[in-house]
Each structure stands twice: as structure tokens, then as C-alpha cells.
Swiss-Prot record:
GO terms for molecular function: GTP binding; GTPase activity; translation elongation factor activity. Belongs to the TRAFAC class translation factor GTPase superfamily. Classic translation factor GTPase family. EF-G/EF-2 subfamily. One of its GO terms (biological process) is ribosome disassembly. PROSITE patterns: G_TR_1 (PS00301), G_TR_2 (PS51722). Its main location: cytoplasm. This is Elongation factor G. The gene is fusA. CDD domains: EF-G, EFG_III, EFG_mtEFG1_IV, EFG_mtEFG_C, EFG_mtEFG_II. GO terms for cellular component: cytoplasm.
Amino acid sequence: MSNQEFDLSAIRNIGIMAHIDAGKTTTTERILFYAGRTHKIGEVHEGGATMDWMAQEQERGITITSAATTVFWLGAKINIIDTPGHVDFTIEVERSLRVLDGAVAVFDAVSGVEPQSETVWRQADKYGVPRIAFVNKMDRMGADYFAAVESMKEKLGANAFPVHCPIGSESQFVGMVDLISQKALYFLDDTLGAKWEEKEISEDLKERCAELRANLLEELATIDESNEAFMMKVLEDPDSITEDEIHQVMRKGVIENKINPVLCGTAFKNKGVQQLLNVIVKWLPSPLDRGNIRGINLKTDQEISLEPRRDGPLAALAFKIMTDPYVGRITFIRIYSGTLKKGSAILNSTKDKKERISRLLEMHANERTDRDEFTVGDIGACVGLKFSVTGDTLCDDNQEIVLERIEFPDPVIDMAIEPKSKGDREKLAQALSSLSEEDPTFRVSTNEETGQTIISGMGELHLDILRDRMIREFKVEANVGKPQVSYKETITVSGNSETKYVKQSGGRGQYAHVCLEIEPNEPGKGNEVVSKIVGGVIPKEYIPAVIKGIEEGLNTGVLAGYGLVDVKVSIVFGSYHEVDSSEMAFKICGSMAVKDACRKAKPVILEPIMKVAVITPEDHLGDVIGDLNRRRGKILGQESSRGMAQVNAEVPLSEMFGYTTSLRSLTSGRATSTMEPAFFAKVPQKIQEEIVKK
């Protein structure tokens, strides 16, 4: 069913996001079941979940790639993206949030906000994505809905408000009171939660529910001060407020990111999922509510604003690449304006390349249906795009617009990889090329000294899973080295160099002469190369060769061969020879010159620092902190609740290999930890000397 048959206001593009074990994929599975997409409920722990379609996901019981699927509910079309909760796959979360209009954050009723929930929440803040929350696993020992709501306020700074009051808890959890309709919902276990009975609120809960409802109405009145009629009703006659009036104000508050309503339930036991579906439709924004999309007009370099209209100019963002053994390369896109038709020729404005769409597919996890067109608000997949990668803009040939790009973090961990046999060499190159196209945080490079192929990623699990995929999908057998830290080099003071490259060996010689000035760039800004050549001392046609040589020279540092970052290079002077100068000579000279300048600019080695969060029983707290200190960690703070303590620290990645195993033995298996890349910092001198020796 295309969006042509759907009013734009009835479309919801949503993500489901959470910490690794909060039950996110199970929640999505139940949504698919109740909305009629699957006839049998998939269980994650049995390896049968529809959304976890990669073999590695079904084995590990975690979600790695964001599967996209479409369901219909209450007359609305909901495009759902299930995102991974493991920190090694933050890129999947990042790129999903970039193209979503709203999200459901799933929390565990026992743990509340966990470290990874904070990361995902911050990513959603960055893109201004409206969110509602679902406190899952209400049937677990120690489940506490109200404590989970409080932890959202404290740790996330969310304006979290309960819209349910649970009836019973742990194994006695039977349903919830809906504070808006003021009805108690009791789920019938024999119908798999598909049916429930509405009853009056029991006497023992009446007072608590009245208080919660009054708090909710007061909050709604304050977040929409322009709605005076609603405010007066709340103050003077709250009982006269209709459900529709509450839903209207709630919807406005959610879309404006002023409130995060919190529901409760247990997806695994089928309680509360339809209630969640109802409010996804009622409260989360449509593409219209999210407003115009901003971009840059390439012809005028002016910022432009595009309305979400079917008949508008085409503007779409490629947000994921997938390689399929039968169909080939599939590009997932989100359309912000206009309509995309099968067979049409379009422009990739990011790369200035023409593309042709051979097929359009609507995805349901890894099943697919052919479509003739996608239109504004759609999330779909295209076959036939050769040049487009994640973050590229697709538009009409005559309307050159570029949308805001997706930013990707640098990898922090390296491994050497080599084919087991000569026959595997070509297959390995093909596999690495496909995987790095799919995942922008996976990089492939060659160590110039040893000639080894190096793969880099966001963590050990990330590279492990990619290695698994090589064996399964590309049938490549490869040997992989031990994980190594992905160090970088930079300079700390300004420097300069004058370099001549002269070769005479009979016949035509080689001649190039380049003078450079270098200085540290702002941290995180990357390398910049500018030409300040005047008067043609180096002819125009050789400048690109000098720049290419400098860029290649920066790829291998002067201390230990790690790539140089945050260096600003200016080409200031030089000379040439009428006969002997060539592009090759200037390229070699550029590379030699930048190396020479860097040696004079007090180079240092930088190491990735990880943000580490450890949750441990309080009686092991001293051991955990002592161990982090021994690993050169900087303790940022700690907080305790219900006998458990959370320690937040910044620790160099080089000290964290095998940490999970040692934490397990330190705390008898009772502590858990997460870590994610935070920033790069200068390595202590003694450690720098050891790295250089190696």
C-alpha cells in the first residue's frame, strides 16, 4: 500500500531504541504480531525473531542492523526501525535517528535507565526526535515502574510522566490503569494478551490514580500555556476534560519535545503492546509535524527549506547500504520531499553522479515487496544505485540540493587480517569493500611498512561480527590478528620545511621544490591543506599533485607510522623545472615535505579514551574503583541505588582489553560494564616511548 493511499498526517516513521537487554526486539515482535504482520510470535531467545534476520543476530540474541518494516494500525501506516542497543553499533542508531520522526524508548522495569540508554537518548536529543517511553518487563522480580520513571528524570533530564498506574507487580502484574481514560485494564492470559477487560479502578488504587492524574493534567496545562481553555478546566473542573482534549495537548507536548509520557507493560507476556501502538499513532509526529527539511542549494550555495509535499522537488537521504545475495546492493532511503519512481534517473548531489533506480522495495525485516514508487514520508529500499552510500542526498537532476550529512565517529580498534589461501585473496578484497560500504565506521587500510591489510572498527564485538559475516556471506576464510589500539599522531607546535626532490639518471630527470608551513588544527577538525602559492612559482597544474602527496604523507605519521590528524598545512613557496618537473615529482616532494615539517613540530601520539560505566554490587565498589585506577582511569563520579553502584570513568582503550573477563572474576560475575569511545588524548611520555620502540 503506497503513501498515495495515505494522508501524510497518517504516517509514522518511528524507531525503537533501548539498552541491550531491555526487550526492544521482543516489543517490536509483539507490535508486528498485533498489527497482523506475523502470524506466529517470534521469540528472541529461541532465535526466531523476525526483525533479527542475520544469522549472527539469531545466535547472539542481539540486534545488529536496523531492520525496517511497515505495519498498519488505527488507520495509520507505521514504518518501524528496530535499532541495536550494543554500543559497538551506535552508528546504526545514529543513522536511524537521523531519518526518523519519533521514537519509543524501551526501559527495563528493574534497571531503569542503564548506561547505553543514556547514549541513545543523547543521540535522539541531538536530532530533536520526540520520544515516548515504555517500561517493559513489569513481571520481573524487583520491577518498579515509578523508580524507572524517576531514573529517566534524574539521569536523562527527561520530562517523564507516568500515564499508567500498574496493577500488581512482578509475577502478580495483571494490567494497568489508564490515567487518561480512568479505566483499569486487565489482560486475559488465555488470549495471549490480545484481549483485555475494562473495569472500574479498584478501591485500593483510586486515591493513587487520582493523584497521578491530577499531576499529569497540571503538567499538560503548564507545557501548553497558549491553551487557556484547557488550563481553566484543569484548575476549575478537571472531571469535565475529555479524553480527546488530553490526547490533543499530549500530542502537542510530545511533538515539541516538552514531555515524555511513560507507559508500562511486559512485551514477552503480551501486556500493554496494543496500548503502546495506540499512542504511537495518537502522540508521535507525522512527517508534516516535523516541518520543513533544510538543505543547501548547490547552485547558489544558499540554505533552502523544502516542504514535505508529494509534488515538490525530490529530496531523499540514503541512510543504509545492505548487500543481498540475490538482489545485490540495496540502498535504504528516507524521502523528505517529492516522489521517486521505479526506472527514474536521479542525481546523487553529494557525489555529483547520476543514478538510475531499477527496483523499489518495501521491506519487512528481510522480506520484500516490489513497489512502483515511493513518496514523501516513505522509508524504503532502492536497487540499482551504484555510487550512493550512507549520508548521500538523492534529488532531481535539475534541483541540486544537499541535505545535512550524518556524522560518523572514528574507529578505535584495529586488527590485521589476511586470507588463509591465495584463492581467498580476491574474495577477501571484495568482502571488505562490501562491508565498508555498508558500515561507515568500519575502515580498511594497508600498513605501508608490513603490507598487511588492517581492519578498524568501534569495538571487539563489532569486528568479530564482521569477521563472522565474511565467512558466512562471502565464504572467505581469513586469519585475524589480535585487536590493537587505533592510535593517531598529531603535532603540538608550528613547523616548516623546504624540500627538493631531484633525480638525474640519464635522459629526463625529476625535479620538484616545495616549501610548507604547518600548525596544529583545532582538535576534531581534521587535516586541512591550503595552497598560498602566488605568481606561478609552482604551476597551477602541479598544485593538486602536491596536495595529494601531502594527504598521502599525513596517512603515516613520523613517530610510529599512525595517521596524523588535526594538522593544517599551507603550501607557501616552491620552484619547478621546465623539462624535469612532473606531477609524480611534485607528489613525492609534497609527501617528503610534510613528513619533514611534522618531525620539527613536536609530534605526539594520541590514544582513544573510552567512557566506561560499571554497575556493581556496593560490596565490590572499592575493588572496581581500584582496578579502574590501575588502568590509568579517571573516575568521574558514582551513584548508588538499591544496593548497586554505578561508577563512571574515562579509561584509555589500551588498558581495557579483556576487561569484561577480569571484571567478572573481580565481582564473582555480578557486575556489568559498557564502554564507548569518548575522545582522543595525548599518551603519557613513557608509554609513547614504548609504542615507538615497537
